[in-house]
From Swiss-Prot:
PROSITE patterns, per the entry: SHMT
NCBIfam families referenced in this protein's UniProt entry, alphabetically: PRK00011.1
GO MF entries: glycine hydroxymethyltransferase activity; pyridoxal phosphate binding
CC per GO annotation: cytoplasm
Name this protein carries in UniProt: Serine hydroxymethyltransferase
Subunit structure and binding partners: Homodimer.
Site (Plays an important role in substrate specificity): H224
Record keyword Transferase present: yes
Family: Belongs to the SHMT family.
Lineage: Archaea, Methanobacteriati, Thermoplasmatota, Thermoplasmata, Thermoplasmatales
Residues with the N6-(pyridoxal phosphate)lysine modification: K225
Function: Catalyzes the reversible interconversion of serine and glycine with a modified folate serving as the one-carbon carrier. Also exhibits a pteridine-independent aldolase activity toward beta-hydroxyamino acids, producing glycine and aldehydes, via a retro-aldol mechanism.
Keyword field: Amino-acid biosynthesis, Cytoplasm, One-carbon metabolism, Pyridoxal phosphate, Transferase
Record-listed E.C. numbers: 2.1.2.-
């Protein structure tokens, strides 16, 4: 019976792979790994432990782990042009946990992006910052672009004198105007922390902004969104040695013990691939995002930030109030084979999280599997037919499956593999 239970779980995992293999995946926080990265994820590294820093471990048997971590740090350093790299966090939120423990104490004031303006839940009072016991204050922002207003934010920074200024969003369409706020940072003497989880691959590809050269002391991020690696995290720095030591101590022994060695190795492989393919990949992501946003707008959808070209990242936000609301649209599209998520927009109360006004769309995964501008036009048409024309979801789903059949292989990497193939070992 237990064996049959195990097989039933495997069957569900196979069905999950098939679902995404036949769907257009537009979740802005997901991606698919390269063949080399996937391969190392099922290596013996998955079973092992390594506490501390390379060559100063608390466990034996880490000789090759140390070399892998050294190489990963070397590649990250080259990719992001900094000597301060830490590939140990096991997720973006784990990296954020280390950052807040290193940079602030309970009672300190931290300036953050508003949740209604696309801010991440880890910066909310019910997230990591709240659990750390810090006080928060939100930046004013442009409600149409969901971007911090640098002039008004500078006034607040100078007046309130936060210990830390945190930037970065989960609806991250435009670069943060860090340079415009540098005078306020310098006057107050705060640490500047940039959560680049969503745009890390665009930063690596030199197509978004360079936060470490624009005023950020610390950059945290997950490594599985526009940076197309494993579910893992990273911290980068351009700060003084004492602050960096505090960050590393916060990582271990502060917020983790073992750092998931297989994922760290996959991160290193992805960094190597980004050095070769990342610039083209980032450029194509942004081109596709602009194309899809423009097509949706031309079909009558209320895409935010029209006056700025809709987006400069992988993400766009769409107000679908007139189309039934975010919950209805997301569920209808899922039934039609198009997977994205409902999302709060600036004019929504947080209590509307179960049925907000908007949807969030990201194109990094469909770009990763080879889709281009012509496919963006086709996807926009499918969304229009499902939501506006209310065509039968099963009919749309078959067309989505047919479209996806030509775009299942991972690009911008070494090797060629079906991104959604289920790999059996027995």
């Amino acid at each position: 019976m237990a064996y049959q239970d195990a097989l039933s779980i495997r069957e569900l995992a196979q069905q999950h792979n098939a679902l995404f293999g036949d769907s257009v995946a537009l979740i802005a926080s997901e991606n698919v790994m390269s063949p080399l990265a996937r391969e190392v994820m099922i290596s013996d590294l998955e079973s092992r432990y390594a506490e501390g820093l390379p060559h100063h471990r608390y466990y034996q048997g880490n000789n090759f782990v140390d070399l892998i971590e050294d190489k990963t740090n070397e590649l990250l350093s080259k990719l992001f042009k900094t000597e301060q790299t830490d590939p140990r966090p096991i997720s973006g939120t784990n990296a954020n946990s280390a950052a807040i423990y290193a940079l602030a104490k309970p009672g300190d004031l931290v300036a953050v992006p508003a949740l209604s303006g696309g801010g991440h839940i880890s910066a909310a009072e019910f997230g990591i910052l709240g659990m750390r016991g810090v006080r928060t204050i939100s930046y004013p922002y442009d409600k149409n672009t969901m971007t911090v207003d640098p002039d008004e934010a500078s006034k607040i920074i100078k007046r309130e004198k936060p210990k830390v200024c945190l930037f970065g969003q989960s609806v991250f369409m435009f670069p943060v105007p860090l340079k415009e706020m540098k005078g306020a940072f310098d006057e107050v003497g705060c640490k500047v922390w940039y959560d680049g989880a969503h745009v890390l691959g665009l930063i690596a590809g030199r197509k978004f902004q360079d936060p470490l050269r624009e005023g950020a002391d610390i950059v945290t991020g997950s490594t599985h969104k526009t940076f197309p690696g494993p579910q893992h995290g990273v911290i980068l720095g351009n700060t003084d040695s004492e602050t960096w030591k505090s960050v590393r101590r916060a990582v271990f022994p502060g917020v983790l013990s073992n750092h998931h060695l297989n994922a760290m190795a996959a991160l290193g492989i992805t960094a190597a691939e980004e050095l070769e393919f990342g610039e083209k990949y980032a450029s194509d992501i942004i081109d596709n995002a602009k194309a899809l946003a423009g097509e949706l707008y031309s079909l009558g959808f209320k895409v935010l930030a029209e006056e700025r070209g809709f987006t400069e990242s992988h993400t766009m936000a769409v107000d679908v109030t007139q189309n039934g609301g975010g919950k209805y649209v997301a569920e209808t599209l899922e039934a039609s084979g198009i997977i994205l998520n409902k999302n709060l927009l600036p004019w929504d109360d947080n209590k509307k999280s179960q049925n907000p006004s908007g949807i969030r769309i990201g194109v990094q995964e469909v770009t990763r599997t080879g889709m281009g501008k012509s496919e963006m036009k086709e996807i926009a048409s499918l969304i229009y037919r499902a939501i506006v024309k209310k065509e039968e979801p099963s009919k749309i789903k078959e067309e989505v499956k047919d479209l996806k059949s030509s775009f299942r292989h991972v690009k911008y990497c070494y090797g060629d593999v079906d991104a959604y193939e289920y790999i059996k070992l027995i």
